[in-house]
Structure formats: structure tokens, C-alpha cells
Amino acid sequence: MRAVFRRVGGLLAFLAAVVLPFGGAAWGEAGPSVAAASDLKFALDEIATRFRQQTGNAVRLTYGSSGNFYRQIQQGAPFELFLSADEDYVRRLANEGLTVDGGERYATGRIVLFVPKGSTVKADPAFADLRAALGDGRLRRLAIANPEHAPYGRAAQQALVHEKLWAALSTRLVLGENVSQAAQFAVSGSAQAGIFALSLALSPDFAGKGDYVLIPEGWHEPLRQRAVLLRRSGATARALHLFLQQPPAREVFRRYGFVLPGE
């Protein structure tokens, strides 16, 4: 992309890459390493806790952008299970012989327009006030994930293109390294609004911190999310992969706004 972006948090992203060379923030003390898209942060934390309670097995969760994980897995990152926010990355890894099989779709995600408390921009599903705020100067910065490697960032870009706002907003974007960072930019007031995952807007950390509206599904390509076992996967990773498809995990995904296969 040739658009000029406002990049915030570059130093933090660099430090994260140094401390955790194969991903972003990690959760869990032991067990197999799991690479998970950032939109899963709260849902998967709950699911991993339930999995440990039922099986006694812990897993190490690392959250980040799916595109970055794709490249890291290609380069030999020691993950056993990959939960991608874009199933195309899983297909590519499968074609390259780096997975056990083609994986399983576990959910389809949704995106929201979020405005933090104190923002003069209003959340409306038609982007009417977003467009007006762009014209009258109320909207100085809009937070999204980086479309170059974050599926939720691409969906945000597609929604803005659909509404013919992308060109006008391209110099006002605050790009998160992943969708979770973009959400933090929005909720912290670093931007007057943000477009990010519904699953994050529904999390306890965001309760009471702003307003949001669902963005129509037709404004962007479906966020079909797929999990796949990698070649190095062991028994615990395989058990977690199966657990993701069971009712306890599906209930958590549903509560965080994901659309589940078959529903």
C-alpha cells in the first residue's frame, strides 16, 4: 500500500519481538506453544482454563497477528497449534507441508466501530457521523490493525473502502501491530474511534469504556477463522484442538460474538 500511515507503538512492537521472537504476549507457564490470533485473547484464555481444569494439561498461548505467525511458522517457530483469523494462512501452510492436515474452521468473526468514552464521534452503523467527523475535524485518528498482516485490519480497510472513506482516512490511521493493539489504541483515547473485533469489544476489559456498533457483514470479506495442528504437535496440542470443537469451548466462542460453524 502506498498510503502514508501514522504508526504508533513501534518501540513496543520491537521490544515484544525481542522478548518473544515467535509472537506477542504469552499466557500460561508450561505446555505446548499455541499461536493464536489476537481477537481470541479473552475467549481462548477462558477456553484454556477450562481445558486445564478438565484435563490437567496447561498450554502456552501466544497472541499476535495471523500474518506474522504465518511467517514465523514458515521460519520454524516452535508452535504446535495455530489458530488463525484468516483460514487462507492455514491453507498456505498446509500446501507447504507444515501442518498435519487442512485444519478445522472454528468460528467466523465480526468487526465493530468503537468510540471511547469522551470521544466526540458517534458510533453509528452507517458511518454517517464518522464521515461528518472527518469533514469537520472531530476525527483526527482512527485505529485499525495493520492490513498488511492482520486479517481484522484488512476487514476494516475493506469496510472503509466500501464506504468510500479509505482514501480520506489513510493519513489519519493509527495502525496496531495486531487487532488487540488497535483496540487498545481506541479504548485509551489515542484515537477518537477504532475498528476492531467484536470479541474484544465484548470482553470484560472493555466494559463501560465506550460504545460500539456492528459493521454490516456485506462491507467486508468474511473473517473465517481456522485452527490447524502443526507438524511438531504432541498429544496435549491435539487434545486442545479437539476441545475447541466441543460444547464448552463453543459456548465461550459464542459468548464473545463469534459465529460458529453450522450456525
Where does each model-flagged region fall?
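Bacterial N-terminal signal peptides
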Residues: 9-23
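Exported/periplasmic ABC-transporter solute-binding proteins
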Residues: 25-63, 67, 71-77, 84-87, ...
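N-terminal secretory signal peptides that target proteins for export/translocation
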Residues: 1-6
